[in-house]
A protein has these predicted regions:
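Alpha/beta enzyme core
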Residues: 14, 19-62, 66-71, 75-85, ...
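Nucleotide/phosphate-binding sheet-loop regions of phosphoryl- and nucleotidyl-transfer enzymes
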Residues: 245
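A short, acidic, flexible beta-alpha connecting loop/helix-capping segment that sits on the rim
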Residues: 234-240
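C-terminal extensions of enzymes
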Residues: 270-272
Length: 272
């Protein structure tokens, strides 16, 4: 592993090999997003909660650069692509909206791309080509690449899990340094996927639905299955204002501090 890549991955993942990243890049695709009406104010609070880092757009990285201009600043991962129009039978259209060079210039620690895979083969080929191009540039700059394989249109279930696991393997083969993917539903599949890929696997949260208890149980199971951490945004900051900061702290303690699922549930019940 090159020195620059090793250094940046060492910032993203703690000595325990884990990370807790809070995404705030949703406005890049969704525009106005509930819970993220003032991302700068949210970030100002979130920085003090113990999160290892944040996933953000180029514009947000530029606007909040001063928040990270100190020695112990959290890491930042730059979202370099976006997807528009994906709904029902429309696979949508994806495009690069930032670059590896932008991440280097702004002092970020990694770049992230989407990998929608329940799409026509021509779009799969274009996606693979786009990821390979970013990986090539990132390798030259020794910049880690996070890839997010996702079934955009399939309902949650075994078929979507199969698509995302299949795409995760392809992402690794394309050179991804980190795979961000949905929890596959049970610890056995999670462990098998982590063993197969051989690169850190971090779990996304998905749409801001479901219960806090369900989220905590999912995170606990994912970590038990070998996940190297979580990259969860909406299911945290779309909670009630009284809850989301306590939830973020509890997730940090689950990832790094050995807090069990049941203990985390107790913490949140006390906070509520």
């Amino acid at each position: 592993m090159s020195p620059g890549l090793s250094y940046r991955l060492g910032r993203i993942f703690g000595q325990d090999g884990r990370t807790m990243i809070l995404p705030i890049d949703h406005g890049l695709i969704g525009g106005r997003v509930h819970g993220l009406e003032n991302p700068r104010a949210l970030l100002d609070v979130a920085i003090g909660l113990g999160c290892d880092g944040f996933l953000m757009s180029q514009g947000m990285a530029q606007q909040t650069a001063q928040m990270f201009g100190h020695r112990d600043a959290p890491v930042r991962v730059l979202t370099v692509d976006s997807l528009y129009g994906a709904r029902d039978q429309d696979p949508g259209s994806a495009a690069l909206v930032a670059s590896v060079e932008t991440a280097v210039r702004l002092g970020l620690d990694a770049v992230k791309l989407l990998m929608p895979w329940d799409v026509p083969s021509a779009q799969q080929a274009a996606t693979a080509e786009r990821i390979a191009g970013v990986v090539k540039l990132a390798t030259a700059w020794e910049m880690p690449v996070m890839v997010e394989p996702i079934a955009m249109r399939l309902p949650q279930g075994p078929e979507a899990v199969e698509v995302e696991c299949h795409a995760s393997r392809i992402a690794m083969e394309l050179g991804a340094d980190i795979i961000k993917v949905g929890y596959p539903g049970n610890v056995t599949i999670m462990k098998s996927l982590c063993d197969e890929l051989g690169v850190p696997v971090v779990i996304l949260g998905g749409p801001g639905t479901g219960t806090v208890t369900g989220l905590l149980r999912m995170v606990g199971d994912a970590l038990a299955g070998g996940a190297s951490g979580i990259v969860i945004g909406r299911k945290v900051w779309q909670q009630d204002q009284r809850i989301w900061t306590s939830l973020a702290k509890a997730l940090v303690r689950m990832v790094h501090g050995g807090l069990t699922t049941d203990e985390a549930i107790d913490v949140l019940e006390a906070a509520g």
